[in-house]
A protein has these predicted regions:
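N-terminal intrinsically disordered, cationic/polar leader segments
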Residues: 1-40, 45-47, 52-57, 65-71, ...
């Protein structure tokens, strides 16, 4: 199977999953996509591929925007802190892009993996309660 066919299959598979995913799973997929785009950014910087770096970092920025948009700031400190952390991550991405330096990407990756591990650890029952509450609003 060629790379083009694999990419098309992956894209279609992701689109199908997103079509039926609940909000918890969508956030999970966004975080995973962010980590994947970070890896692409890192590879592009190491290869000195300016175009690929710009594309991958732009996609990271867009995902961060989506993650920020998904936060309900009315819940107080935790979503507010996440919002600020996503802003910090955005600044570090700009640093990496400007300086062609992978160390900010490593830092941002560790931050996102920490957030994602917490997200992934939310018990199923709590997710169901949150989704039920969200649907009733």
């Amino acid at each position: 199977m060629s790379f083009k066919n694999i990419k098309a299959y992956t894209t279609q598979n992701l689109q199908a999953e997103m079509a039926v995913a609940d909000s918890y799973r969508i956030i999970q997929l966004m975080m995973q996509g962010f980590v994947e785009r970070l890896a692409q950014s890192k590879g592009a910087i190491e290869r000195r591929d300016f175009e690929a770096k710009s594309i991958a970092i732009s996609k990271c920025m867009a995902i961060l925007n989506g993650l920020q948009d998904s936060l309900d700031l009315s819940y107080g400190k935790v979503p507010e802190d996440l919002f600020a952390l996503y802003d910090y991550m955005r600044i570090r991405l700009l640093d990496a892009s400007r300086d062609m330096d992978i160390s900010p990407l490593d830092e941002v990756c560790q931050l996102m993996l920490t957030i994602k591990s917490g997200w992934d650890a939310i018990p199923l029952e709590e997710r169901k309660k949150a989704l039920t509450k969200q649907a009733s609003q």
